Amino acid sequence: VLDCDGVILESVDVKTRAFASTVKRLGPQAVEILLDYHRSHGGVSRFEKYRHLWRELYGREIDEQTLARLGEAFAAACFEGVMRAPFVPGAEAFILAARERWPLYVASGTPEDELRQIFDTRGLTGLFQGVYGSPRTKADLLAGIIAEHDYAPSRTLMVGDSVTDLAAARAAGSMFYGRGEFPDQPSAADLTGLMDFIDGLPCPGS
């Protein structure tokens, strides 16, 4: 099970710039609050990030109309950038090889309809058994994939780049491989070594 932004596609910076552009008119404090939360909560829905901003900046909940408007502005600001984003090094080769051996899934914090549009347009949908996004949380998505297909959690691998991804793996009882730095977890700067990592795992019953 792979996250999308920062795991399959190098799209994290695209979304960081998009977040900044949507709240720039609210001032530098708003930008700082939103980007700090965004960077430390990868894999969390954009709508939850805007809710956090409103609570911190104004001490109240954001109204649904404003939330929807910000979500639409964000989607418009980042869609083309995500469409052009390159693969994370090693990701494309891993996916093409791994799909011949195991069922692959995507679990992302991006709204599901938008995520599927991106994957359809880029010709990626057919590489995966399922492509899933928000509003369900990352933990719910991973648990749902495991339950629906009766997979053994201990034989399921979550590949992510955020503490949200790691928390989802821990909640599900699955293995985890991080893109980036994850103390005490198997991880690397990219996905070029992911297949070797999987091939080095002990076989069931061994």
Question: Across the structure, where does each feature detected by a protein language model lie?
Answer:
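Metal-dependent phosphoesterase signature
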Residues: 54-90
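Active-site neighborhood of HAD-like aspartate-dependent phosphohydrolases
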Residues: 1-36
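Short, acidic loop-to-helix structural element flanking the phosphoryl-transfer center
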Residues: 76-106, 112, 116, 139-140
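Short beta->alpha linker loops
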Residues: 14, 45, 86, 90, ...
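Short helix-capping segments at alpha-helix termini
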Residues: 25-30, 58-62, 123-127, 150-151
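Conserved SAM-binding loop
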Residues: 8, 104, 158
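Asp-based, Mg2+/Mn2+-dependent phosphohydrolase catalytic module
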Residues: 112, 116-206
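Helix-loop "lid/cap" segments that line or gate small-molecule binding pockets
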Residues: 20-24, 45-62
